[in-house]
Amino acid sequence: MTTEIRALYTRLPAIDRLLRDPAFSPLLAQHGHSQVVAQLRQMLDEAREQISQRQTLPDWSHDWQHACEQRLTAGQRSALRPVFNLTGTVLHTNLGRAIQAESAVEAVASAMRAPVTLEYDLDDAGRGHRDRAIADLLCQITGAEDACIVNNNAAAVLLMLAATASGREVVVSRGELVEIGGAFRIPDVMRQAGCQLHEVGTTNRTHAKDYRQAVNDNTALLMKVHTSNYSIEGFTKAVDEAELAAIGRELDVPVVADLGSGSLVDLSQYGLPKEPMPQEMIAAGVSLVSFSGDKLLGGPQAGIIVGKRALIAQLQSHPLKRALRADKMTLAALEATLRLYQHPEALREKLPTLRLLTRPAEEIRRLAERLQPDLAAHYADFAVSVAACQSQIGSGSLPVDRLPSAALTFTPHDGRGSRLEALAARWRALPCPVIGRIYDGRLWLDLRCLEDETRFMEMLLR
């Protein structure tokens, strides 16, 4: 070891001396002795490593208190950070899907602050059922006899199959054996539920006779799966829910449907493509219908099953129900969201998902044109332009449909793609990260989901 390197090691402070420094008192008070000591030990290890490898001290070594504070503060930052979702995907799975309505946020906060009547009946001072209040709401909205709530729609499908068809056959069209994100496949779910898959028809064409011919003494269910994340077009044929329900009644076999996204309102009245609605399935005679809470419904992550009272009772009494049940925060948010549907005239205003999906393209374009001059002046190395674009709903909902929108695009004057990557990384490192997408040599910020204009500009003009 040379004299110079030995001198560098001697400049490293002892942890005890640092802790006695008055500058560290606020850190000790805020983060505690253990965390501060652990952070200082890590910093000392880094400094020793740099001396060994590069024969220099780290740049931060002139102010140990400041460096330690920065690291501790960064370490305390929540893993679930608010971001600006300007990707063009409204219900972005990686960004948490539906934004909750204010009433849902307030309901969750209230449920977290105090004991609540989750499973307590105030009328007779006995044990109640956690799904009861929401089940009543869902029955009012959908016309179902009863309802069951679990923690997501994958769980809803699993419970529905396990409780009503374990050890028996479930008949499904080959064209509806879907896979959604995260490798959730209908055949795999059936296997986990203990069911036997009985495929009928072909990928593009399935007829009523295919279902009739498939039914046997071991048939438990006829199942309809909404292909929400893909579309088969051209020479096609499918049996709709009403016809399948009629076949089920004729052969005395229950019919169940997995809608995936599930919308409780007719989206076509807002100028959006129509999605199948649970109440339509119930009216058609389907025995059980499952759908998501955090997609088109605009609520928290939840799996909702509505349908016949006797079948719902089977689900509620199945051992899996306890493992899959929703907690009080989910139920509070879901109840508040469903109550918004009781006042449909105000739904578009109060439900963020519907508000964002129905936002007029011209309004978004005016927003982009208003922001463009200041951003163009600030980002001199880029051509900042307003461009028409197409948003998508996301989360497997209406996969082939697009929503006209407007974006701010950033194109480097020197044409170097590395500048786009660097700019995107810079925005992701902001206190409130800005998430866009790189496409066609430009960084796009689709403004459909931008509502806090002031905060957004504070971030980008830093």
Curated annotation (Swiss-Prot):
EC number(s) from the headed UniProt entry: 2.9.1.1
Cofactors, names only: pyridoxal 5'-phosphate
Keyword Cytoplasm tagged: yes
Keyword ATP-binding: no
InterPro entries per UniProt: PyrdxlP-dep_Trfase (IPR015424), PyrdxlP-dep_Trfase_major (IPR015421), SelA-like (IPR018319), SelA_trans (IPR004534), SelA_trans_N_dom (IPR025862)
Top-level class of the enzyme under EC nomenclature: transferase
Name by which UniProt lists this protein: L-seryl-tRNA(Sec) selenium transferase
Organism per entry: Klebsiella pneumoniae subsp. pneumoniae (strain ATCC 700721 / MGH 78578)
Gene encoding the protein: selA
